[in-house]
Amino acid sequence: DVAVDLRSNSETYGKWYGVILSAENKKQFLIPEGFAHGFLVLSNEAEFCYKVNDFYHPNDEGGMAWNDPEIGIEWPQLKGEYKGNASAESYTLEDGTALNLSDKDQKWLGLKDTFKF
């Protein structure tokens, strides 16, 4: 799991923090308002549960490129090269498994083009 600070007045704007969550380590990850959230599933199966601070509003949904070099998230077990967009086609996991991203997630722009809080 990864969180990226989108608060434009923050000293940590554009910085990321990540943690591996698993059934074994039983960790949870609290992501405050003003941060983007992303995750990479490293197993064949996963159960993903989350809680938010308000009701879902489709018009409030946003996103950013998961592989933006300006942020430089170090995704675990990932091999590949940035090709100028959020497409997963040039990336695999270390075991050769292809990434599976939704069409929506492959179209997000980088940090500089993302909304700020």
What are the roles of these predicted feature ranges?
Residues D1-K27, L40-E45, V52-F117:
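Non-catalytic, conserved peripheral segments adjacent to functional cores
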Residues H37:
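Active-site micro-motifs of SAM-dependent methyltransferase domains
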